């Protein structure tokens, strides 16, 4: 149903009480609740401060890796490809959605930097008269101006020093209050390998942004182009994934609405049936009151079972919807607000997340129905010596209670029909006593998983279903039996298919000489021969087994399966005994 969530032992940093995901838009950390500081983008597309992530309790699982880099998180722009043997993989849990995050080799600081969040923080700070912004040079004083040439925020002292230097004398300086109308004021994104160079190009071969020094160095022979020239192709691929993800949000919302309606219907039916039960039980005084209490308890059990099932499905769909919304909202924000370079930097994480979300399977229909009814005329046995009437009927099949029956359930022969019985039961373990349930059977060869065997399911109309299939080849097969898309007891199970039973084409004789009437050219599979040019076996002669056997394969048991494989091992004269 939903994305894999890994339980974590020990303390894990969680959201503070009353905190919701995505608090304060895109500028505040969901953990510390303050403006983002060095925000890192997780594979689930949630953003958290670097220091907050470092404070989370990590866990480790054994991970086998070859010569590939970590793919769970993009990390920084550059990652070395180093072969790694069996080693523990360090991970954390996302403090927003509890998704497992496998950390790259560089740890938290190797996760992708969320440049969109940094830009939003800058804009948020400007709206608050620059409060919270510190000088990019001295990191000590509050910002007063911004150098539009260097794209750096400067305090008054550094601004004066900036103007006194010959190289920066003529740089354009702007007051912070004059930048409030800007939508993009982020810092230039510099190359990790060459900090003096800005990332302006994109390597198609390595699928990552590069600088000018990278192009003439490590990526000299690689196809590279400016980010503005390649953004259309890569942006279109992300938009295509987004178009495939958006319909899931509507489908999940509709499914949750159906669950809510079904839950209300269940509650209404419970109330109605309870009223019927109370009305019917008034005439029988103590006996009926006792019977009534039993019926109400049974009804409550049914309600709890149905409600728990609906609540579980609701929780799973809500979590999946939250994940889908996060993916859609972040991607839409990225495509509408992000720069070309920001889209390219974040593209890998977004594509991986949306691809994973698009592969998640879920049911858009409630897992249970509101079918609960009361039959007042149905006999319910004796209660305190009185014959009472009235029973609750749900008769909803419970896959966990359904069983498989058959003598040769795990054995079959090639090209011969095999069969077994599926007995459907309800939640109380009683036979359904009727047909109409959706029984699905799949028979798959273990060595040819893409070639399932054709199966037939016959409804006997009494709660049992006759399943038959004919395996074409010997080997091991896996049989999956599902009711309401859930496995029944004993499913899946394996079936060993042996070769088809082969009858003997020869004769069961004491020796070739006797069975052939003394023919010299008659042979026997036992390998015995006789002097005088006889090709077959004879009593007391060389190679004779000393007991009756089959002429075709040499087996001693008269009632057995022939093992003669044909071809060179069985000349034509070997079977002449049959004709004679």
From Swiss-Prot:
The residues listed in the UniProt record as binding Zn(2+) 1, with positions renumbered to this chain, are 135, 138, 158, 162
SMART domains with a match to the protein in the record: BBC (SM00502), BBOX (SM00336), IG_FLMN (SM00557), RING (SM00184)
Give the E.C. number(s): 2.3.2.27
Enumerate the residues binding Zn(2+) 2: 191, 194, 214, 219
- Zn finger region (B box-type): 130-176, 186-227
Q: Which InterPro entries match?
A: Bbox_C, Filamin/ABP280_repeat-like, Filamin/ABP280_rpt, Ig-like_fold, Ig_E-set, TRIM45/56/19-like, Znf-RING_euk, Znf_B-box
Q: Where in the cell is it found?
A: Cytoplasm; Nucleus
Q: Where are the zinc fingers (RING-type)?
A: 29-98
List the catalytic activities from the record.
S-ubiquitinyl-[E2 ubiquitin-conjugating enzyme]-L-cysteine + [acceptor protein]-L-lysine = [E2 ubiquitin-conjugating enzyme]-L-cysteine + N(6)-ubiquitinyl-[acceptor protein]-L-lysine
- The keyword Zinc is annotated on this UniProt entry: yes
* Filamin repeat ranges per the UniProt record: 394-497
Coiled coil stretches, renumbered: 281-335
Keyword list (alphabetical) reads: Coiled coil, Cytoplasm, Metal-binding, Nucleus, Repeat, Transferase, Ubl conjugation pathway, Zinc, Zinc-finger
Per UniProt, what is one GO molecular function of this protein?
ubiquitin protein ligase activity
User: What SUPFAM superfamilies does the entry give?
Assistant: B-box zinc-binding domain, E set domains, RING/U-box
The main enzyme category here is transferase
Q: Name one Pfam family in it.
A: Filamin
Entry-linked PROSITE patterns: FILAMIN_REPEAT, ZF_BBOX, ZF_RING_1, ZF_RING_2
Give the CC-aspect GO terms: cytoplasm; nucleoplasm
Question: What is the purpose of this protein?
Answer: E3 ubiquitin-protein ligase that plays a role in the regulation of inflammatory response. Mechanistically, mediates the 'Lys-48'-linked polyubiquitination of TAB2, a regulatory protein of the kinase TAK1, leading to its degradation via the proteasomal pathway and inhibition of the TLR-mediated inflammatory immune response. May act as a transcriptional repressor in mitogen-activated protein kinase signaling pathway.
The Swiss-Prot or TrEMBL record describes its family as follows: Belongs to the TRIM/RBCC family.
The protein's name: E3 ubiquitin-protein ligase TRIM45
Q: Which gene encodes it?
A: TRIM45
């Amino acid at each position: 149903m939903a994305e894999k969530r890994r339980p974590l032992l020990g303390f894990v940093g969680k959201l503070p009480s009353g905190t919701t995901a995505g608090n304060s838009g895109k500028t505040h950390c969901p953990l510390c609740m303050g403006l983002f500081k060095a925000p890192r983008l997780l594979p689930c597309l949630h953003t958290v401060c670097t220091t907050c992530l470092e404070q989370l309790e990590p866990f480790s699982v054994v991970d086998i890796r070859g010569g590939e880099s970590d793919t769970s998180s993009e990390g920084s722009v550059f990652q070395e490809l180093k072969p790694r043997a069996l080693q523990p993989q360090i991970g954390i849990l996302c403090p927003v959605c509890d998704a497992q995050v496998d950390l790259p080799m560089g740890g938290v600081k190797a996760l992708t930097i969320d440049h969109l969040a940094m830009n939003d923080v800058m804009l948020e700070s400007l709206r608050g008269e620059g409060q919270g912004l510190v000088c990019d040079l001295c990191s000590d004083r509050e910002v007063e101006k911004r150098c539009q040439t260097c794209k750096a925020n400067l305090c008054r002292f550094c601004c004066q020093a900036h103007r006194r230097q010959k190289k920066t004398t003529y740089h354009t300086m702007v007051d912070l209050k004059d930048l409030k109308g800007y939508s993009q004021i982020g810092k230039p994104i510099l190359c990790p390998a060459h900090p003096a160079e800005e990332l302006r190009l994109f390597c198609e071969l390595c699928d990552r942004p590069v600088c000018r020094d990278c192009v003439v160095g490590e990526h000299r022979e690689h196809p590279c182009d400016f980010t503005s020239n390649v953004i259309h192709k890569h942006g279109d691929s992300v938009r295509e994934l987004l178009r495939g993800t958006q319909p899931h949000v509507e489908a999940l919302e509709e499914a949750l609405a159906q669950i809510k309606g079904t839950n209300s219907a269940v509650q209404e039916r419970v109330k109605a049936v309870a009223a019927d039960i109370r009305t019917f039980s008034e005439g029988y005084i103590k006996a009926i009151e006792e019977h009534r209490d039993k019926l109400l308890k049974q009804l409550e059990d049914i309600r709890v079972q149905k409600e728990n099932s609906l609540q579980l499905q609701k929780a799973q769909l809500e979590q999946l919807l939250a994940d889908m919304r996060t993916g859609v909202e972040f991607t839409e924000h990225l495509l509408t607000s992000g720069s070309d370079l920001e889209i390219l930097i974040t593209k890998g994480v977004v594509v991986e997340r949306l691809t994973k979300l698009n592969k998640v399977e879920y049911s858009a229909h409630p897992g249970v129905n509101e079918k609960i009814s009361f039959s007042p005329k149905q006999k319910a046995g004796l209660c305190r010596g009185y014959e009472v009437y009235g029973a609750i009927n749900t008769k909803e099949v419970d896959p966990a209670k359904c069983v498989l029956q058959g003598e040769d359930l795990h054995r079959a022969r090639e090209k011969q029909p095999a069969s077994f019985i599926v007995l459907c039961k309800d939640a109380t373990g009683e036979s359904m006593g009727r047909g109409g349930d959706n029984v699905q059977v799949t028979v798959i060869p273990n060595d040819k998983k893409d070639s399932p065997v054709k199966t037939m399911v016959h409804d006997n109309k009494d709660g049992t279903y006759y399943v038959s299939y004919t395996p074409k080849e010997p080997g091991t097969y896996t049989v999956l039996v599902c009711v309401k898309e859930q496995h029944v007891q004993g499913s899946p199970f394996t079936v060993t298919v042996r070769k088809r039973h082969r009858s003997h084409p020869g004769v069961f004789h004491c020796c070739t000489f006797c069975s052939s009437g003394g023919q010299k050219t008659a042979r026997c599979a036992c390998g015995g021969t006789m002097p005088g040019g006889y090709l077959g076996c004879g009593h007391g002669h060389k190679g004779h087994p000393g007991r009756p056997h089959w002429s075709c394969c040499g087996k001693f048991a008269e009632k057995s399966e022939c093992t003669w494989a044909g071809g060179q091992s069985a000349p034509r004269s070997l079977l002449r005994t049959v004709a004679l």
